[in-house]
């Protein structure tokens, strides 16, 4: 029983709790609704207040407009009699306007008739007046007055034109007298002389800069060649070391296998150790077979000779390039004699070079001498190239009148007639330099590379008998003409001038240089017979003759030479095709 009661009580409690929760939730919802309704009511009250305010404002406006309408009605009632009065006055004014308009029209017609009558009377009076003599005189004077006025206007226009012309003529002329004109021209000539001197200085400085640039280029090329040679020698030395190692290994193997066949191997190695020369020189060289009883000594000598032959090949090719540059410059400078001497000397040197030594005991000495000669020979080639470039520039400035096509044709023909020859490898020569004459050493010509061969100390070669080098023979055919324009000149290009004649001409030109006045006179086209600075004017300045729009006034200028500028008798030896001066025209 108790259990059932507890269960029922529990159920009741649960139901009450559930209902209580439901009531709480409903109460909260109702509270929320009430709050919302209160807010809505407040908003509606606010809107109602606004509406009441607008209603009150509209009521006030309605009252104001009602009062204003009543005032307007009162005014209308008051203004009605005045309006009636104004209407009556308007009607009266219209009636008066119609009356006045009719009267004005009648007056117009009457006055128009009067005007017509007066015009007819005036015409009658004019006819009567024109018949009188006074009227005729009046009209004649009137016509004369009009003509005089027209003439006066034309004269005033002419006077204005003349005044403008006169004002133009009143401007002062730039040269009021002939003396001032001549002085101005003299000043202009002096200014042109100064400009020409400045231009000559600039040309000299530019030529010097060009020479320096050429020298720097030559030095750069020479350094590049040395670098390439150094690299090639390194590569060759490496290859030779590798080959030597390979040959030593092969020799050891062959000695082990074939102990008795060393004689055959030495023969094959001597055939492979020939000098490596160009194709033309190989035709003249015959292979020399070396027989020795000692195989080791022969192998060492053959290896050293092979090294020398390869180094000779490298230096030989580089010297060929240098000789080609030198020969090209010689052809451009029109020097056949220099070509002939270089060709003959180089052929003689080649004949000596092609003789191979039968003894190879001095191979180490030759290699040491070769290194010294290579350095000295390279310096000589650089000097030769500089020398050839200077001479080519000088002769180009001397013969600038000739066309470029003729020069190119002559260069090609001379290059075909005189073939280029190759030179010997530098290391085969001796460090003894070829000596030039004493007179040429004073002028400080660049030394030429050595062309002597001294393989056998006891034997004297034939080449040492020639004391003059081809580079000096090339320069011997030129003499200095003037320091300003030309550096070298020759009377006949096919003949050579000796060293004594060269010194005589050189001293004569140094003792008697051209003066500044002579150069100025030559620049201003002075005849040889005139002296001094003269002006020639006509006696009567008023009598001028004009022809073809130009004045016949003569104005010659002549600049004289100084007493010290007379050319010496020693200069008569120079027989050149062109004169010593160059003419410039400025005007």
Curated annotation (Swiss-Prot):
Residues 356-378, 568-587 are annotated as: Disordered. The modification Phosphoserine is found at residue 439. InterPro entries: SIX6OS1. Pfam families: S6OS1. It comes from the Eukaryota. GO terms for biological process: homologous chromosome pairing at meiosis; meiotic DNA double-strand break processing involved in reciprocal meiotic recombination; oogenesis; regulation of DNA-binding transcription factor activity; spermatogenesis; synaptonemal complex assembly. GO terms for cellular component: central element; chromosome. It is found in: Chromosome. Highest expression in retina, skeletal muscle, testis and colon. The keyword Phosphoprotein applies. Residues 357-367 have a biased composition (Polar residues). Its main location: nucleus. Keywords: Chromosome, Developmental protein, Differentiation, Disease variant, DNA recombination, Meiosis, Phosphoprotein, Premature ovarian failure, Spermatogenesis. Residues 368-378 have a biased composition (Basic and acidic residues). Interacts with SYCE1. Interacts with proteasome subunit PSMA8; to participate in meiosis progression during spermatogenesis. Meiotic protein that localizes to the central element of the synaptonemal complex and is required for chromosome synapsis during meiotic recombination. Required for the appropriate processing of intermediate recombination nodules before crossover formation. PANTHER family: PROTEIN SIX6OS1 (PTHR35449:SF1). It is linked to Spermatogenic failure 52: An autosomal recessive infertility disorder characterized by azoospermia due to meiotic arrest at the spermatocyte stage. Premature ovarian failure 18: A form of premature ovarian failure, an ovarian disorder defined as the cessation of ovarian function under the age of 40 years. It is characterized by oligomenorrhea or amenorrhea, in the presence of elevated levels of serum gonadotropins and low estradiol. POF18 is an autosomal recessive form characterized by irregular menstrual cycles and cessation of menstruation in the third decade of life. The uterus is small, ovaries may be small or rudimentary, and do not show follicular activity. This is Protein SIX6OS1. It comes from Homo sapiens. The lineage of its organism: Eukaryota, Metazoa, Chordata, Craniata, Vertebrata. The gene is SIX6OS1.
